[in-house]
Each structure stands twice: as C-alpha cells, then as structure tokens.
Amino acid sequence: ETSIPDDIKNIKPPILGYFGAVDERIDFKLLDEVCAARPDWSVVLLGPLVQMEKTPVERPNFHYLGKKNYGDLPNYLKAFDVCLMPFVISDLTLHISPTKTPEYLAGGKPVVSTPIPDVIADYSDVVAIASTSEEFIQKTEECLSDKIGDLHIRIRQKAETKSWDYIAGEMKKMIMNLE
C-alpha cells in the first residue's frame, strides 16, 4: 500500500505532476502559462535539477519538490491527478522516448504530453497530445473531468502491453518461431 508523502500531501488538488530530470527539455513557458491560466490547479515537478540553479516558474501554484528516491515515486504518483510530459519540441526532444510514459500508465493515471514523436507513435491512443498551452489546458481539463470515457481501462491495457514481462514474452515467441 502506497502512502502519499508529507511534502505533497498538503498541496491543493488537482495536482498535475511530472517526475524525471528537470532540465532544458522541460517547457517552462508552457508550465508558466498553465499555472497562470489555471491558478486553481497545482503543478508539481519532482527530479534533479540538471544544469540549472532553480526552476524558472515562480507562481504560487507551481511546486518544485526536488529529487526523490526512485522507490518513492509510486507514492508521489498516487497524489497526481494528471501526469505531465511537458517537453519543449526541439532537436533535443525529437528523438527521446520517455520511459516515464509506461511508468505513468502503470500507475493508471491520465497523461498529457507535448507532441513527442515516440509518444505519438506508441501511445496516442491513451496519452492526450497538446501542441499549445491552450490545448494543454483543454486536454488536462478533459482528463480531470473524466470526459474520456473508458480511458482508465485503455490505460491499464496499454500498460500491460508495455511491461517488461509482456515484451519478454513476445520476444520469446518470436525467437521460438525462428526455429
């Protein structure tokens, strides 16, 4: 049983959360615009700061909680209402394949992402894709209002097909078919 950590427990929901490296790949302008447009939402980032002293967003509803132990992330994920993948679209991000996508989905949480090619190719059936701050807000509102129908069922099904056990089983089948 996971318990919500103290440093996130008192943050006002809904909580839009991200965990991972906090670096130049994060679209801080997008996050600032989301925080400004929706002061009733809380945006939470977890992870090590990479090549920066502090996060550039200074809003009362923006919370940087620092680096956390990997084993504690499920406890934080439990507090998230929507998971974020707010990456800048640039040469740095065109070829990334964020491992957090299946991690978020394994937690059964809705995800909103900027248009990362690998996320679109592999997860657009369960991840909301948004190119602008307005779209990001709209997709997040849809996730929060549960206007997405059977999304939770589809998230679980997708997470199962992206687990290491499932992938290993599929690879074993392919190898067996070669013989």
Label each region the model flagged:
Residues 8-26, 35, 43-46:
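Conserved donor-binding/catalytic core segment of Leloir-type glycosyltransferases
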Residues 148-176:
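A charged, aromatic-enriched C-terminal amphipathic alpha-helix characteristic of glycosyltransferases
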Residues 71, 75-76, 83-106, 113-123:
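Nucleotide-sugar-dependent
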Residues 13, 47, 52-77:
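Nucleotide-activated donor-binding/catalytic signature segment of Leloir-type glycosyltransferases, i.e.
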Residues 31, 70-73, 101, 136, ...:
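Acidic, amphipathic alpha-helical patches
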Residues 1-12, 54-55, 179:
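Acidic anion/phosphate-binding donor-loop and adjacent secondary structure
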Residues 16-20, 46-47, 65, 92, ...:
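Short hydrophobic "strand-cap" motifs at the C-terminus of beta-strands
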